[in-house]
Amino acid sequence: MNSKNICINVGMNADVSEFDQIEIIKAAGFDGVFFDWERTVDRKREITKAINLGLELQSFHAPFYGMDDIFHADDTLSDKMLNDIIGTIDCASEYGSDLIICHAIIGMDNHSPNDLGIRRLEKVIEYAEKKKIRIAFENTEGIEYLQKILDAYGELPQIGFCFDSGHELCYNCAEDTLAKFGKYLFSTHLNDNMGQTGDEITFYDDSHLLPFDHGVADWNEIAERLHKYNFDGPLTFELVCKNRPQRNVSDKYEKMTFEEYIAEAYKKADMFRKIYNKQ
């Protein structure tokens, strides 16, 4: 149970191109990366560069713009989203990653998962099994959807949970989502924020701050909880180096060069790794 590798997302809303980010990420000391998958964006150059530099392809992140369509829209819109998940599975298979990440839902007002959505998801779950790809669903807003999906499919070997520490704080009202879903744990998206700062849950609070910085997460407690569920995969961080709209909590990052930001990200990620490995 010794998580030695630390991984990070490519992108981060940075001004530096994804192609140029990869070498900087490698030079900082990270062991791997994950990429977003988008039907209209060809990342072959970036992915190939990461492979050639010896970076692990930890996962590919499926689009999430239409996850609510799977549960609440007609077949045309639902199929569009399902086909994008299938596209993400194909990309992972092509480049040798065995994991994709999906949101369970999108939309702060969605709280009514249904059997229709569960039946529709069967298409991608069967395809993932055929391609030998695992799918980890995140704790996002509308945690009822994650519960419904894992109740239906969580015992399948290709279906699991991606723990997002930031979402837990600002979307899930700091509820212990690992206590609910830890037995399904496949992956992490580790980041911090200021919690829910107003009366309503909002995307603007999902700041993706560095650990051990100025967010509200208790990183020792997070390490303890991950250990409780025997997590031994790479410690994967999902970070953003720009402010969300109407927020200024990332001002200090915006003043850094990308090289400075990634060096600081690695320093903080390594701090967490050392705490985790001492558990």
Summary of predicted features, one role per range:
Residues G11-E18, G32-R45, D69-I70, G107-S112, ...:
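Acidic-and-aromatic substrate-binding clefts and catalytic sites of carbohydrate-active enzymes
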Residues N52-L55, Y127-I133, Y153-Q158, K228-F231, ...:
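Short helix-capping segments at alpha-helix termini
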Residues F64-N83, I106-L116, I201-L210, P245-M256:
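Surface-exposed, active-site-proximal loop segments in enzymatic domains
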Residues H214-K228:
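A short, acidic, amphipathic alpha-helical segment used as a generic capping/interface helix at domain edges
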